[in-house]
């Protein structure tokens, strides 16, 4: 399978390139970056001291030439541009970008009628196992427990709460028969009054180089249960993304998530 990487000079882009180069059965066929990037024209493996023969380019058609799948962990506005090109060229996509609005999510769903897409809030196997644990816990602790989602990320992250935190909230809300759009509480300040027992609260921390910490607290009277996942490296995300690309090999169309890739549905 031939794989192209978007955001090739970024932290996640470099991790993805390294993962592709170190995975049997896949080949790096293209590397994309934004116009004006100082990395344009460089070999995609330069940061590793390896010559891949793939030059980083801002030309979407050139970067996607020969690709079976594009892996994109960039920003919503960039991903949507890449999505349009991939759809036109028949290139499948693995999308790890977070922060999409409803229109962006609808565009992904529409494109999935033409190409195979894996779109997930988090590509870590551990995080996706945590989603299943939260589903079970929410059903067991459906009454008498207040639910709070606390997440922490590095200072450079531009969206909040994280896509993973929101997915955790959605999993819990679905398990309880609630709608996160109406029960989610994303800010508290001043005299807020007593806590709504049906609400799901979110707290966001940004600082330093934290890769990603997520804790869901089920707080009852006299006891508290916490389910946590802490990432020490982006390696698990890169591994899951390449695994997702391979999953799409026999999927000409359709919108999938990491639960599909792992067979957890």
Swiss-Prot record:
Its main location: cytoplasm. This is 4-hydroxy-tetrahydrodipicolinate reductase. It catalyses: (S)-2,3,4,5-tetrahydrodipicolinate + NAD(+) + H2O = (2S,4S)-4-hydroxy-2,3,4,5-tetrahydrodipicolinate + NADH + H(+); (S)-2,3,4,5-tetrahydrodipicolinate + NADP(+) + H2O = (2S,4S)-4-hydroxy-2,3,4,5-tetrahydrodipicolinate + NADPH + H(+). The gene is dapB. The keyword Zinc does not apply. Gene3D superfamilies: Dihydrodipicolinate Reductase, domain 2, NAD(P)-binding Rossmann-like Domain. One of its GO terms (biological process) is lysine biosynthetic process via diaminopimelate. NCBIfam families: dapB. The active site is at residues 153, 157. The keyword Transmembrane helix does not apply. NAD(+) binds at residues 7-12, 33, 96-98, 120-123. One of its GO terms (molecular function) is 4-hydroxy-tetrahydrodipicolinate reductase. Pathway: Amino-acid biosynthesis; L-lysine biosynthesis via DAP pathway; (S)-tetrahydrodipicolinate from L-aspartate: step 4/4. It comes from the Bacteria. It comes from Cupriavidus taiwanensis (strain DSM 17343 / BCRC 17206 / CCUG 44338 / CIP 107171 / LMG 19424 / R1) (Ralstonia taiwanensis (strain LMG 19424)).
């Amino acid at each position: 399978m031939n794989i192209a990487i978007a955001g090739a000079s970024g932290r996640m882009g470099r991790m993805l390139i390294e993962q592709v180069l170190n995975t049997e059965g896949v080949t790096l066929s293209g590397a994309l970056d934004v116009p004006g990037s100082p990395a344009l024209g460089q070999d995609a493996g330069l940061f590793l001291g390896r010559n891949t023969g793939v030059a980083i380019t801002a030309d979407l058609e050139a970067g996607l030439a020969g690709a079976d799948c594009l892996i994109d962990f960039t920003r919503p506005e960039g991903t949507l541009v890449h999505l349009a090109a991939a759809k036109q060229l028949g290139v499948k996509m693995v999308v790890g970008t977070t922060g999409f609005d409803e229109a962006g999510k609808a565009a992904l769903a529409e494109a999935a009628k033409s190409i195979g897409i894996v779109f997930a809030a988090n590509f870590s196997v551990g995080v996706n196992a945590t989603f299943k644990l939260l589903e079970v816990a929410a059903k067991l602790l459906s009454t008498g427990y207040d639910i709070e989602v606390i997440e922490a990320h590095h200072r450079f992250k531009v969206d909040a709460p994280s896509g993973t935190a929101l997915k955790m909230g959605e999993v819990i809300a679905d398990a309880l028969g609630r709608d996160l759009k109406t029960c989610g509480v994303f800010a508290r300040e001043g005299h807020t009054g007593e806590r709504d027992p049906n609400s799901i609260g979110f707290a966001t921390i940004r600082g330093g180089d934290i890769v990603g910490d997520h804790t869901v607290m089920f707080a009852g009277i006299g006891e508290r249960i916490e389910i946590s996942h802490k990432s020490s490296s982006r390696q698990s995300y890169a591994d899951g993304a390449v695994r997702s690309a391979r999953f799409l090999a026999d999927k000409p169309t359709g919108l999938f998530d990491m639960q599909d890739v792992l067979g957890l549905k």
